[in-house]
Swiss-Prot record:
InterPro entries: JmjC_dom (IPR003347), NO66-like (IPR039994), RIOX1/NO66-like_C_WH (IPR049043). Residues 123-137 have a biased composition (Polar residues). It comes from Culex quinquefasciatus (Southern house mosquito). This is Bifunctional lysine-specific demethylase and histidyl-hydroxylase NO66. GO terms for molecular function: 2-oxoglutarate-dependent dioxygenase activity; histone H3K36 demethylase activity; histone H3K36me/H3K36me2 demethylase activity; histone H3K4me/H3K4me2/H3K4me3 demethylase activity; iron ion binding.
Length: 648
């Protein structure tokens, strides 16, 4: 039998000074409406056509973008300047590759193209019966590891040859609401979860093609079985800790083990500091013991035997189980999903008390570890945006929760929750900390929004461009902050009225695009099923003819059906008077190893992308795309691994 400690109900008095708020549990979220992916294709197309009609009526909100240059020069990594003659703009990569045709750079009147897209959406519905194979990929992407891609197609953007940076994705744990001083724990009895033969196939039951739904199923597995995703998000997310005690030591066993760690160290060039830390916390002193160079097994295990903790900063790069979990969860959360693992010997502690800037999910894999959680000390530390320094035991107060995790258990706590953990006598500990929502708050969005909104407002409002009063400095600043003169009060009213002019709905779109663009750089490359690989560029078959030609055996026609590989695989962004299509199929499993990947497209090609985004996970025949050179457009996306394609 497993027990799931779910809800920290009755708040106990806070023994520390009353500097924090009392966080009440949120009401369960209302059931969401069916997503477009769950509706019939006809309903989806009708809905999109109505949206296009409304957009056409609201002409004042659509800007006419100036035409962009047909080509531009960019320096490659060796410092040479190259001019791309291809209709696809890119920053040059090192080896010269065949030209990718299809996407020109030219911004035109958006309203005309919206009308074209609306007609194309109607055409998709009309041709639905004619396209016999519009349902692609019978199973979700459940776990074949992505092989190294061959560089046979021309990159549409430049992937910078940036040296691998020091990995910053360290164990961080996201902030949490203010004082939740728990006491009573509701315990539910559940049958023991049956052992899963392979972690890579446990979510295949729904058969969904929507990558967000597949990610939701993976998250349900992480927090399950007795609490649903909706219940968790309504009652615990960013509010208070959540504990699951499963009594199932095999639940997370396929993620990693000491044996897999040893194999990883032997077969890969794991470096101290960049990939792995050796730490200790003794008598109130936190130390890092990293030597230089490669972390070889004899040295790492010697540190471990001496009582040091081992922290791996990017296990998803080397361990397939962790990679499979993270790559699915990033689709659900639509933000960077990181992981660290921590291996701690018996009777020891590796880290001082602290809080982190991420939402933390602790997945206990081996051994036992005793955890202590503490409320944020002040209101400003609730859902903290920056991780804390190390604290002394005297600075953190009394624990709100103490628990010993055993294999198969889960502990979640929001950012800002102070925590520390140590192994118990006679038991080592191995756990994975999965982290999400770093720098993904409303404040982070508004930091992107305000510069755009202010710039736009200054163009539209003369009052914002007028000069400030000559005597403004005599009424504001530290020296004058306690003044209550009539002039100061009038100026405050004036400034408030100017701030009111800054709001811009268009700037919200720009800011969200920039946030989503950041995700494209942060994201792990997608994990493909065998069937997906066969229908993408990664599984392309070529004929090696006696005459020396190497033709592609996959024929693209207007009856070929396509769809995006993942819901969040691309983001169309308007920046620098150019439409750019950011994507992450060419990312490395190592965080920010390369510069962001993007294609530069014209308005015609952008409408084709917009159609694919809006009908996902449905497919569309190439002949129904609202672009001029339909087949070349589809090939350009296919060559970058962005779509799956199925012939007649």
């Amino acid at each position: 039998m497993s027990k799931v400690s779910s809800i920290f109900d009755t708040p106990a008095p806070d023994p520390r000074p009353a500097t924090t708020e009392n966080g009440a549990a949120a009401k369960p979220a209302a059931r969401k409406k069916k997503s477009p992916a769950a509706a019939t294709k006809k309903q989806l197309i009708d809905q999109l056509i109505r949206e296009m009609s409304q957009d056409e009526d609201n002409n004042d909100s659509v800007d006419q973008a100036p035409p962009a240059k047909k080509s531009r020069k960019k320096a490659d990594s060796s410092g040479n300047n190259n001019t791309s003659k291809s209709s696809v703009k890119d920053k040059p990569a090192k080896p010269k590759k065949p030209k990718t045709a299809g996407l020109k750079i030219k911004l035109q009147d958006h309203r005309k193209h919206k009308e074209k897209l609306r007609k194309s959406l109607q055409g998709v519905e009309n041709s639905r019966q004619a396209a016999a194979s519009t349902s692609m990929l019978e199973a979700s992407f459940n776990g074949d590891s992505l092989k190294d891609r061959s560089n046979h197609s021309t990159p549409v953007h430049h992937k910078g040859a940036k040296a691998a940076k020091k990995n910053k994705n360290k164990s961080h744990i996201m902030p949490l609401p203010l004082t939740f001083t728990p006491s009573k724990v509701v315990v539910k009895q559940e049958p023991k979860t049956p052992r899963r033969p392979t972690m890579l196939n446990v979510e295949a039951s729904s058969g969904s093609l929507d990558s967000v739904e597949i990610g939701r199923e993976k998250f349900s597995w992480v927090i399950g079985p007795s609490t649903t995703v909706d219940e968790f998000m309504a009652q615990f997310w960013e509010k208070k800790p959540f504990l699951v005690q499963r009594n199932d030591p095999t639940y997370y066993a396929n993620l990693l083990s000491r044996g897999k760690i040893d194999e990883m160290l032997r077969n890969n060039n794991i470096e101290y500091t960049k990939n792995l830390d050796v730490t200790s916390y003794r008598e109130g002193v936190r130390e890092t013991h990293n030597p230089d160079g490669r972390a070889l097994p004899p040295d790492v295990w010697a540190f471990y035997e001496e009582g040091c903790s081992i922290r791996m900063l990017n296990p998803q790069t080397y361990l397939p189980g962790v990679y499979e979990m993270n790559v699915k969860l990033q689709e659900f959360f639509h933000c960077m999903t990181g992981s660290n693992f921590y291996l701690t010997p018996p009777n020891s502690q590796g880290f001082a008390p602290h809080y982190d800037d991420i939402e933390a999910f602790v997945l206990q894999v081996e051994g036992r570890k005793h955890w202590k959680l503490y409320s944020p000390r002040t209101a400003s530390e609730v859902l903290a945006r920056v991780s804390s320094p190390n604290f002394t035991q005297e600075e953190i107060g009394v624990p709100i929760l103490e628990v010993t995790l055993e294999p198969g258990d889960l502990l979640y706590f929001p950012r800002g929750i102070i925590h520390q953990a140590s192994t118990v006598p006679g038991h080592h500990s191995l756990h994975v900390t999965m982290s999400v929502y770093q720098k993904n708050s409303w404040a982070d969005l508004l930091e992107l929004y305000l510069p755009h909104a202010l710039s736009q407002a200054a163009e539209n409002h003369l009052e914002l461009r007028r000069g400030i009063p000559q005597d403004l400095h005599q009424h504001f600043g530290i020296v004058h902050s306690d003044n209550e003169t009539p002039t100061r009060k009038d100026l405050i009213k004036k400034i408030k009225s100017l701030v009111d002019k800054i709001f811009s709905e268009e700037a919200i779109d720009v800011a969200v695009d920039q946030l989503a663009k950041r995700f494209q750089h942060d994201a792990l490359p997608p994990l493909l099923t065998d069937q997906e690989r066969a229908q993408t560029a990664y599984g392309a078959n070529y004929a090696f003819n006696p005459d020396g030609t190497v033709p592609l055996q996959t024929a693209f026609t207007e009856r070929t059906t396509i769809r995006l590989l993942r819901r969040n695989i691309v983001r169309l962004v308007n920046e620098e008077n150019t439409l750019r299509l950011y994507y992450h199929t060419e990312n490395s499993r190592e965080y920010h190893e390369y510069e962001p990947n993007f294609l530069e497209v014209d308005q015609d090609a952008a409408l084709g992308v917009e159609l694919l985004v809006k009908i996902y996970p449905e497919t569309v025949a190439i002949g129904a795309l609202p672009v001029e050179d339909k087949v070349e457009f589809a090939k350009s996306l296919w060559e970058k691994g962005l779509i799956v394609a199925r012939g007649e």
